């Protein structure tokens, strides 16, 4: 019997002997909220919302563009490239080097993708921020793409949808990053003058100069459940004020309760909600457009009978 335990286990084909190369590393994803493991395909099929706790995970700009009608998106201003106006160098690397590395890793030129598309057949301009590109920090290209999207929407006479996530202004560009707040907001005034709506969607996280500027003056402000929205972070505020902030502070639900946003919409209902809003605006504008046309016709010279 003792010899049995000395036998070679050479023929054992248990789990430990399975070639690890045959098992992809990204089959499973751990939810950052409930810490449960989720099959990646199941997560993607559920729009990156945890099926166990409902936590909304971050999506890329390209994934958000999936809200649009299939085949309707046409990217604009993809030729805009960021520069290094200050020759900024941090302790470990230069801004130029960091940009190049981030561009190679993400396949994006900067943090925003913009263009023209449609939802339920209704044309609109769209600009989407991607947190994976330097925390979607707002620099010159970010601001220029957002401003051009607003101006294009005004020119075409169609609504603007912005999907916003950010850590704030891009520090490596100094005051140029900060001035994008005013630049985008001014472009949005031209959109308002054209009688077209700006719908802003806030997704986790949305902080700093982005929250403090153009999304907060949108005609309709939507947020995802549990999204963190604010100017400075909760920890920093507590340190400065030296007092504990209320539970749920800076969450989408807290913002809704205090009148800072208009609605909190789960990702599974987002496309349907946006379609309903766009149709509402379209129906409201139709009579106004007819009245405007009649008014312009009235100014034309009348034929002599």
UniProtKB/Swiss-Prot annotation:
EC number: 2.1.3.15
Localization, UniProt: Cytoplasm
UniProt catalytic activity: N(6)-carboxybiotinyl-L-lysyl-[protein] + acetyl-CoA = N(6)-biotinyl-L-lysyl-[protein] + malonyl-CoA
Pathway: Lipid metabolism; malonyl-CoA biosynthesis; malonyl-CoA from acetyl-CoA: step 1/1
Binding site residues for Zn(2+): 31, 34, 50, 53
Cofactor: how bound: Binds 1 zinc ion per subunit.
InterPro entries: AcCoA_carboxyl_beta, Acetyl_CoA_COase_Trfase_b_su, ClpP/crotonase-like_dom_sf, COA_CT_N, Znf-ACC
GO cellular component, one term: acetyl-CoA carboxylase complex
ZnF start-end (C4-type): 31-53
Family the UniProt entry places it in: Belongs to the AccD/PCCB family.
Function of the molecule: Component of the acetyl coenzyme A carboxylase (ACC) complex. Biotin carboxylase (BC) catalyzes the carboxylation of biotin on its carrier protein (BCCP) and then the CO(2) group is transferred by the transcarboxylase to acetyl-CoA to form malonyl-CoA.
Protein name: Acetyl-coenzyme A carboxylase carboxyl transferase subunit beta
Species classification: Bacteria, Bacillati, Chloroflexota, Chloroflexia, Chloroflexales
Gene giving rise to this polypeptide: accD
